[in-house]
Amino acid sequence: MKYYAIGYATNAALPDVTADDAQKLTHMNLAFGLIKDGLLDMSQLTHIGLTEQFRRWNPALKIVLSVGGWGAGGFSTMALTEEGRRAFAQSCLEAVEQYNLDGIDIDWEYPCSDQAEIDCDPRDKENYTLLFKALREALGENRIVSTAVGAGDYFVRDTEMDKVAQIVDYVQLMTYDMRNGFTHQAGHHASLSASRGDTTNTNTRYIVDLFHNAGVPLEKLVVGAAFYARHYTGAANINNGLLQKASSGIYGPDYGEITEEFRRENGYTEYWDEDAEAAYLWNGSVFISYESPEAIRRKCEFVKEKGMLGVMYWEHSADPTRELLGVIADTLHTK
């Protein structure tokens, strides 16, 4: 089976992409296009011209424009009418043709929710499906239409994933930030399994079963990996801080910073939670949840065991060592 290795890369990350990176990836998601006045806006992607070089390095590389991201609004209003959906889909087609892209990825965070302080509507549930229908009709069967989805029961509740799965090429599970800025308990934000005593359902195995049971075929599921950490302060020095009451999970540090400044330095000790199949750092009061090479490898092996499509990660620039991408490529044999 040919597995996918999909990397999200922001505009700022594109100048640092190397030939070796391009050859290890099967897909690159450009982050992000936005919605402005109901149409696709790509004005912030100033380095998109570099993608032609990426194709020369790897002619098989699929380059997909991802639209949305955390705090990106405009989806609900645009998707409310058939006219709005068609106009947006047409603007996506024009961008795909202009920049020689392979498709469109939708990262709507989240339908039916104003959690990210964006517009929402109860009709988002049905309109989410209709948006993908409009994109498929505009882009045709030979271009990629994909989605990135929140890793929780709320996303399944607020969408029609069984219908969406019939339209899109694949569904990317954002199996990170499962513990986040709204969580006040130190724990793993991207773990494969659950820690002993953790009953929160914030682990990849649970999320895969959740979306599969909601109607997404395993062969269309892509598991997410995090190239960054979340840290919690004020945790009690019990069980190395794991599952202790703490501050909310704050973004950072990136994996590159972990390798340079935190791992076995600055008072931090690295630990492995075998139950959760996840790594973390602890210094007596600060708990840092991150994905180590072994954690990434186990996610990749899990993908292979379950017959899923592959692994994607956020975000390319967060690991300048390229150690984690190397683990993905080696385990999934993408290079």
What are these regions, as identified by a protein language model?
Residues 2-3, 24-26, 59-63, 100-104, ...:
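Short, well-ordered coil/turn segments that N-cap beta-strands
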Residues 9-24, 81-98, 153-163, 204, ...:
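Short, acidic/polar
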Residues 317-335:
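Aromatic-rich peripheral "rim/lid" segments of glycoside hydrolase catalytic domains that contact
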Residues 67, 225-302, 331-335:
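Glycan-binding loop/region signatures in secreted carbohydrate-active enzymes
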Residues 28, 65, 106, 135, ...:
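Conserved, mostly hydrophobic/aromatic
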Residues 1-96, 113, 326:
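Glycan-recognition patch characteristic of GH18 chitinases/ENGases
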Residues 36-46, 90, 111-260:
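Substrate-binding surface in catalytic domains of secreted glycosidases
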Residues 27-31, 96-113, 146, 174, ...:
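Short acidic catalytic loops
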